Amino acid sequence: MRRPLVVGNWKMNGRSASVARLLNDILAGIGDCKAEVGVCVPFVYIPQASEILKGTKVMLGAQNVADHNSGAFTGEISAGMLREFGCELAIVGHSERRLLYGESNELVASRYEQAIQGHLKPILCVGETLEQREQGRTLAVIGAQIDTVFEFAGVQSLEHAVIAYEPVWAVGTGRSATTGQAQEVHYHIRSLIARWNPEVAQAVQIIYGGSVKPENSAELFAMPDIDGGLIGGASLDARAFLSICHSVSV
């Protein structure tokens, strides 16, 4: 039985005071939440967040991870460095990284591999643009993104990873995929993995990201192949994020 997972991606938001307030509000309201819960904060706030979350049920994550473990790579932060400060999760391949910073499938796969080797759980983001969807290429695009990761790290690595489907046209736009659209792609992703390893396919958590909010989370999470959410804007509001966390069904 796959346990639901809800992860907040704070993106480039927050100041020290607001980080403390938001994390403490989340901890105060998390209670007997049935889902696993995590937050991916900006790099500079990871030490602060680590102190606040230490010993709690909320996992700490980073929003990216380097594709090398050390060396002359200015501005990069390795999996080992993140682990040292208490990180358990790391987002890789977010659509904003792919689109705004030109990260290729190969670079994303290398980051994913480094996360696995550094004992972080990567959240591998995959998804299509609106143009690709309208061209009927959704499944081919996502298949290529996932296959590249398997070439680098193998399908067995998914035993220690999460996949997040985030349709690019729904990220930060207020426009979400319908439950039917999301379930269709999640089912396809699981079927694609099953071609490599059926047991891994049934075990891996596949979560949805793309304008998830309290108004639509329960319906999305009720779908058989949607195991939770990667939450953007709504994760910056403790009440909204907690509502989403508590909307999971098990």
From Swiss-Prot:
Task: Give one Pfam family.
Answer: TIM
Q: What role does it play?
A: Involved in the gluconeogenesis. Catalyzes stereospecifically the conversion of dihydroxyacetone phosphate (DHAP) to D-glyceraldehyde-3-phosphate (G3P).
Q: Which domain of life is it from?
A: Bacteria
Q: Which reaction does it catalyse?
A: D-glyceraldehyde 3-phosphate = dihydroxyacetone phosphate
**Intracellular or extracellular location(s):** Cytoplasm
Active site annotation, chain numbering: H94 (electrophile), E166 (proton acceptor)
E.C. code: 5.3.1.1
Q: Where does substrate bind?
A: N9, W10, K11, G172, S211, G232, G233
Pathway listed for it is: Carbohydrate biosynthesis; gluconeogenesis; Carbohydrate degradation; glycolysis; D-glyceraldehyde 3-phosphate from glycerone phosphate: step 1/1
Q: Alphabetically list the UniProt keywords.
A: Cytoplasm, Gluconeogenesis, Glycolysis, Isomerase
What family is this?
Belongs to the triosephosphate isomerase family.
Q: Does the keyword Cytoplasm apply?
A: yes
Q: Tell me the Gene Ontology biological-process terms attached to this UniProt entry.
A: gluconeogenesis; glyceraldehyde-3-phosphate biosynthetic process; glycerol catabolic process; glycolytic process
SUBUNIT field: Homodimer.
Instruction: List the protein's name.
Output: Triosephosphate isomerase
**GO MF terms held by the record:** triose-phosphate isomerase activity
Q: Which GO terms describe its cellular component?
A: cytosol
